[in-house]
Amino acid sequence: MSVSDGAATGSVRYSRVLLKVSGEAFVGEKRFGFDPAVVLRLSRDLKNVKESGVELCIVVGGGNIFRGASTSDGFERTSNDYVGMLATVINALALQNALEEMGVECRVLSAMPMTAVCETYVRRRAVRHLEKGRVVICAAGIGSPFFTTDTAAALRGIEMRCDAIFKGTQVDGVYSSDPKKDGSAVRYDRISYHDLLSSNLKIMDAAAISLARENSVPIIVFDLGRDGAFFEAVHGRGLFTTISD
């Protein structure tokens, strides 16, 4: 692992990337649902990345609406997860609307058939949308309970042959511990899949990390809450952590 010595610089370019956006990213200063200002800022960042020539696929979470695995009262796990999948579709449609208002053509593809509101996810169809210059927003995880949207992000990134998976978080990379709770936390510019898993650093779940590792797809962790951070990370600038072998 490489300890950070400042902002990363470089001319790294990706032709096709996947961005994982957690449901919490939509909340902003609110406790629940959507903060319109946050959705607008995120959409502007996505548009800038798209207009720089990068094909963009997005997997959204649903934690701003329903926290499936952590909400057990009155629900069994399978029902929890299906409700959570529906929450991701709500987020995907909201993001699609914001992007289209900015003139960005995009499609929502759901792993659960919902033909009245969006297309059903088919890999070839999703790839074709990317090739036509559309942003693809994947919803409903992988369509099965017991799998997180992090795992869905890894799977979709691999299926669609993305050059990298970008994980938007609330901090500017991977730290040795939570920097919001531990002032001595060390930030890494680079860390291996093995070190990440063995250190039990909770960036993504183990299944997602293992999928990326087995298919040699790097994961880039950055601060999605900072304006322009996604554009910078895609182009090899700014603060981020690269997870790879």
UniProtKB/Swiss-Prot annotation:
Domain of life according to the entry: Bacteria
Activity regulation (UniProt): Inhibited by UTP.
Keyword Transferase in record: yes
Residue numbers binding ATP: K20, V21, S22, G23, G63, R67, T169, Q170, Y175, D178
Subcellular location: Cytoplasm
Enzyme class: transferase
Enzyme Commission number(s) of this protein: 2.7.4.22
Coiled coil: none
Single GO molecular function: ATP binding
Involved pathway(s): Pyrimidine metabolism; CTP biosynthesis via de novo pathway; UDP from UMP (UMPK route): step 1/1
Keyword hit for DNA repair: no
Catalytic activity reported: UMP + ATP = UDP + ADP
Residues at which UMP binds: G62, D81, I142, G143, S144, P145, F146, F147, T148, T149
One GO CC term, this protein: cytoplasm
InterPro entries in alphabetical order: AceGlu_kinase-like_sf, Asp/Glu/Uridylate_kinase, Uridylate_kinase, Uridylate_kinase_bac
Keywords: ATP-binding, Cytoplasm, Kinase, Nucleotide-binding, Pyrimidine biosynthesis, Transferase
GO biological process, one term: 'de novo' CTP biosynthetic process
NCBIfam families xrefs: pyrH_bact (TIGR02075)
Its biological purpose: Catalyzes the reversible phosphorylation of UMP to UDP.
Assembly with partners or alone: Homohexamer.
Similarity field: Belongs to the UMP kinase family.
Protein name as annotated: Uridylate kinase
Annotated organism of origin: Anaplasma marginale (strain St. Maries)
Organism ancestry: Bacteria, Pseudomonadati, Pseudomonadota, Alphaproteobacteria, Rickettsiales
